[in-house]
Amino acid sequence: MSGVALGIEIVSVFFLALFLLHRYGDFKKQHKLVIVGTLLAWYLCFLIVFIIPLDVSTTIYNRCVARHAVTPAPSNITVLSPTPGIVSNTTAQNHLPSADKLRSSDNSLEECSKPWSYIPRGIMPIFWRVVYWTSQFLTWILMPFMQSYARSGGFSITGKIKTALIENAIYYGTYLLIFGALLIYVAVNPNLHLEWYQLQTIGIAAANTWGLFLLVLLMGYGLVEIPRSQWNGAKKGYLLMKTYFKAAKLMTEKADAEETLEDVMEEVRKVNECIKYNHPLRKCVDTILKKCPAEYQEKMGRNMDDYEDFEEKNISYPSEKTLVKLHKQVIYAVQRHRRTQVQWSILLEQAFHLEDVAKNETSAAKQFVHTFPHQEPESWIMRRLYTPTIEWYWECLLRPWCSRILAVILALFSTVVVWSECTFFSAKPVLSLFAVFIQQAEQTHNYIYVEVVCFLSIFFLSICVYSTVFRIRVFNYYYLASHHQTDAYSLLFSGMLFCRLTPPLCLNFLGLTHMDVSISHQNIEPTAYTSIMGSLRVLPLIADVFYIYYPMLVLILCIATYFSLGTRCLNLLGFQQFMGDNDMTSDLTDEGKELIKREKRKRQRLEDGETRRREWKERYPTNREDTSRNRSVNSDQKEPTYTEMTTNRSSKYTRASNRTERDRIELLQDAEPLDFNADTFNDDPLDSESGRYQPGGRYLSMSQSNSRIFDDV
């Protein structure tokens, strides 16, 4: 099995990353470079998480072989080679004859069972160098550049590159600042001599220092909030009330995004009417129009008059710099509008599902009934296995208890992590619980247990860190939505974030397990992953101070999160957060409940209309001859005159002579709901009279109506 397990995991992890990217991204609409860059970033990060357990089990086996090697010398220890970070197993047994060496090796193999996932020497260091440096190139250079390049408002490749370099100066400046400070520290220290390997170690330490700084802050929030969210999710009505609260806040943001988009489209319309077809900047305007939504493009295309010349001296034309700024505003406004639309649709589905769960809890039939059908078609396997009865037992009975059990398990896991983060620096006695578990498994040669514990621990820490990023309001610009609804900017941000935080996260975990020799202070073989990080003894300030004591800050952050100190502070600053004992929370919850009711009525009217249309078609089917004859008549029909239009309009309000005609009229009238209001709804994104975009479907009091009495009838 030498190397087979590594090959299997490399292939399996690639297909896992490809499957997840296909679920969240859109291969057809998004740029190929975005897809390839995100896939590579996710793939490398998943490789680190999945291969670290194999590296740990292989290192434990190699240590066992070195420890049980039989030699006539009084001591038999593993010696560190002169080259930093490279470990040599040269011991006193090198002076034995070849037969004694073979006999010593056989005795070692008999006492140390080889793991099923054993990886031969020399493979893992090369593998980790390729994975680590590729991920660092992606997270620090390529992906930030791609992200800024995609948002740039320039119209040429040179302009986009220039803008991307300027915007990424803060990232490059932060990295160079940390690297320069460490470089000055090493240069000033008279006991240290700069070499290429030491410069490489300084660069790695700078990246890991920046990652660990963010890691502890995010982990302190996630270790408490994830178990608490699972526990609160089992409470009746808690998730539904929180969803109502989110709906009210998201609708406010959605309305603001719509207004921003309309304002930007108004500016685009003015520029489009000002710059004609023969203007030198017309290509720039066409590029801006391609980024606009389809309905706005059609309206602007119909209103454009290409026969007017641009050489009128009284008109002031915008400059190229103004168009670049407008182009960037269009990209941001369209992306924000799309994000709020996607998040709103996801939130509606969650609210409808939670309301269905609340209704079905009192059902005597014990069969789960959905108010609306699923948006995505279910597979025949789910339809056969996940029946309404099974769904009722799961959603109404089993799921709350499973959430409570999972919350208790996660809380215990979080306690272990916090305790280990505060005590992992103690080598004698060993206080870190992760180190205790690994050492016990090392004595019994239970490699499966070692790999499972390592994988679950890293997976839990990753969820605590990454889920916190997408929960924080500051990062609400980015989101991950399934069913191909994640935009390119969020995909690039997620890949950049994963590559930036995963290496220091795994290095921190190896420190918790004392697999890092800089923590255990033993002259034993380190893991291949920690060996490529170099000897941090080059930087004693980082190795002995920051890496040891800074993770203890996670305890303070967990206490602050448990008492919701951050939430209360944000609430006082005006950023409304969900708090059960707050009047503003109650008001927003009631407002969100009304919004969900309104959306449910709209969805119900659409469902009823589709049902009546299907029934009408089944009841009065038309044959192919009538259909073909009607098509031929309509194709030869001329434009109707004013008299014909008046006749058709008046016939809508006359009584039908037979039942078929009455059904047809009823079907046509169903297209407009009972509470339809022409003042609040406009199919045209551009109003022909005022020349300004009119929003459709405004929210609550933001939509003005001449008659509001029968709006909700």
UniProtKB/Swiss-Prot annotation:
It holds the Pfam family LMBR1. Residues 246-314, 587-620 form a coiled coil. Residues 605-629, 658-667 have a biased composition (Basic and acidic residues). Its main location: membrane. The chain crosses the membrane at residues 4-21, 33-53, 123-143, 168-188, 204-224, 405-425, 450-470, 491-511, 539-559. Keywords: Cell membrane, Coiled coil, Glycoprotein, Membrane, Transmembrane, Transmembrane helix. Residues 1-3, 54-122, 189-203, 426-449, 512-538 are extracellular. The keyword Amino-acid biosynthesis does not apply. It is a multi-pass membrane protein. Glycans are attached at residues 76, 89. GO terms for biological process: adrenergic receptor signaling pathway. It is found in: Cell membrane. One of its GO terms (cellular component) is plasma membrane. Residues 22-32, 144-167, 225-404, 471-490, 560-713 are cytoplasmic. InterPro entries: GPCR-associated_LMBR1, LMBR1-like_membr_prot. Residues 643-657, 701-713 have a biased composition (Polar residues). Residues 600-713 are annotated as: Disordered. Belongs to the LIMR family. PANTHER family: G-PROTEIN COUPLED RECEPTOR-ASSOCIATED PROTEIN LMBRD2 (PTHR21355:SF0). May associate with G-protein coupled receptors and regulate downstream signaling pathways. This is G-protein coupled receptor-associated protein LMBRD2. It comes from Xenopus laevis (African clawed frog).
